[in-house]
């Protein structure tokens, strides 16, 4: 009986190992939710990207600030939290609801909300660090500026279906980068 108990304890510890490497306890479901959100974004596509080529734009995703190779572990959670919050804000706007299938949009936003809750839980665990490093504030500003450019683009294009399609594809890339960052940080430990 004692061996079985010890074995189960080891299994429990090992099952949480990948999520503990970030210095916080992200639920194991976090990666699954992230993948599901990416899948939902693909399903939300209403137009062929080819029909919206004239509307394509480089929003300047801050890869150098958020990129998987440059960002440090201590910066990751606040930056990923900001990225997720900005995506959620964008897709819960009243203009967004007119652009997408309501069921897919609700599922996507629910997943984003859960991802955000996971990340905010990690932020609370890191609360003992009072001041943000300058590089972290710089990264947060870069994420906010990036989403400001997206918001301005949508406004300039009057929230047209093609504008939303361009933004959907851009958000997929941003969310995919965040998933890669988490995977890299988990591997580093």
Swiss-Prot record:
Matches recorded under InterPro entries: 4_helix_cytokine-like_core (IPR009079), Interferon_alpha/beta/delta (IPR000471)
Single Gene Ontology BP annotation: defense response to virus
UniProt protein name: Interferon alpha-6
Additional facts recorded: Not expressed in fibroblasts upon virus induction.
Q: Which organism is it from?
A: Mus musculus
Localization, per the record, is: Secreted
Q: Which Gene3D superfamilies match?
A: 1.20.1250.10
- Which SMART domains did the record assign? IFabd
Q: What residue stretch is flagged as signal peptide?
A: 1-23
Q: Which domain of life is it from?
A: Eukaryota
**Keyword Membrane applies:** no
Function text: Produced by macrophages, IFN-alpha have antiviral activities. Interferon stimulates the production of two enzymes: a protein kinase and an oligoadenylate synthetase.
In the record, the note on similarity to other proteins reads: Belongs to the alpha/beta interferon family.
One GO CC annotation: extracellular space
User: What's an example of a GO molecular-function annotation for this chain?
Assistant: cytokine activity
Glycan-carrying positions = 101
* Disulfide bond sites: 24-122, 52-162
Q: Which gene is this protein's source?
A: Ifna6
């Amino acid at each position: 009986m004692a061996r079985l108990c010890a074995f189960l304890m080891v299994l429990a510890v090992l099952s949480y190992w990948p999520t503990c490497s970030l210095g916080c306890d992200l639920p194991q479901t976090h990666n699954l939710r992230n993948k599901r959100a990416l899948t939902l974004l693909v399903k939300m596509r209403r137009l062929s990207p080819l029909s919206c080529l004239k509307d394509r734009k480089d929003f300047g995703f801050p890869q150098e600030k958020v990129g998987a190779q440059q960002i440090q572990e201590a910066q990751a959670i606040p930056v990923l939290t900001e990225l997720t919050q900005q995506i959620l804000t964008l897709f819960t706007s009243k203009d967004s609801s007119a652009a997408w299938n309501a069921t897919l949009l609700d599922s996507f936003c629910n997943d984003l909300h859960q991802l955000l809750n996971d990340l905010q839980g990690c932020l609370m665990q890191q609360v003992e660090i009072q001041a943000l490093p300058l590089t972290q504030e710089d990264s947060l500003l870069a994420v906010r500026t990036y989403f400001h450019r997206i918001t301005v683009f949508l406004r300039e294009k009057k929230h047209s279906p093609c504008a939303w399609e361009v933004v959907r594809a851009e958000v997929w890339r941003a969310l995919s980068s965040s998933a890669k960052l988490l995977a890299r940080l988990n591997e580093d430990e």
